[in-house]
Amino acid sequence: MSPLSAARAALRVYAVGAAVILAQLLRRCRGGFLEPVFPPRPDRVAIVTGGTDGIGYSTAKHLARLGMHVIIAGNNDSKAKQVVSKIKEETLNDKVEFLYCDLASMTSIRQFVQKFKMKKIPLHVLINNAGVMMVPQRKTRDGFEEHFGLNYLGHFLLTNLLLDTLKESGSPGHSARVVTVSSATHYVAELNMDDLQSSACYSPHAAYAQSKLALVLFTYHLQRLLAAEGSHVTANVVDPGVVNTDVYKHVFWATRLAKKLLGWLLFKTPDEGAWTSIYAAVTPELEGVGGHYLYNEKETKSLHVTYNQKLQQQLWSKSCEMTGVLDVTL
């Protein structure tokens, strides 16, 4: 990617962000975001990645409030004990715990899955929520560009390693669910199969958007595989909107200033940002339904290229090669 292309990528990302913020402002002026009513889900088990902060924390808290056994997967050991205690206190649910998982390390992901499976409990909901946003160019422990490696590839590996447990846990009328958090930036993203690591000319904006596009393609292909084998597991992808969290530390200074001064008005709260993830995880309306892109608890169209099954397959096969996952679609 040339410097000019990198500049264009930044402009496109900020343009789509501004459009989402404007839509949120208009909705707030018309009455705001009303909290959906979610059914209780006792005796269900959920894993939430990135559950110590922001949208992930709100998601974990609300699932615990619904009676679920919630396992927070994260790499913030120092904050974990406080977060777990707070959620238990607020929800009166003692079935909340933390397991260390660094999504930037395949070794850590595999260790997390091993520890989880040693518990001998089912898994009904996996929420792929964790991520980084527009960070400077750097690599994961396995040598992947961080947006691609953590946001996308880490969740690709985690999901595949947990699929057997999800399949065992799902049943007719009570499907297990994979919920993956993408973003509106995928609408302005490009997937460069020849340079997934953004090594030619790094743009944090393009790299972030590409990782979110990859998550949509991954979800759609995963759903096709699950449906083809008749398993009682569904996969959907959600867009939380522009949410007032701490992930904006690397964005343009004007965006940080707007967030600081007007975030309360222009941005969704973390709870509001979590509602679509929770909806996808528990609503009876989506029982047995997968392959949807959800925004504000409603299905909407994703970028046209995400429906390209050949591209889905290419990314899936490449991801299997990168992670050592067996490509069953070959």
UniProtKB/Swiss-Prot annotation:
Cysteine pairs bridged by disulfides in the record: none
Further information: The gene coding for this protein is located in the pseudoautosomal region 1 (PAR1) of X and Y chromosomes.
Enzyme Commission code(s) on record: 1.1.1.441
An example Gene Ontology biological process: positive regulation of autophagy
Protein name: Polyprenol dehydrogenase
Binding site for NAD(+): 55, 208, 212, 245
Name of the gene this protein is made from: DHRSX
Gene Ontology cellular component list: extracellular region; lipid droplet
Disease: Congenital disorder of glycosylation 1DD: A form of congenital disorder of glycosylation, a multisystem disorder caused by a defect in glycoprotein biosynthesis and characterized by under-glycosylated serum glycoproteins. Congenital disorders of glycosylation result in a wide variety of clinical features, such as defects in the nervous system development, psychomotor retardation, dysmorphic features, hypotonia, coagulation disorders, and immunodeficiency.
Predominant location category: other
Organism: Homo sapiens (Human)
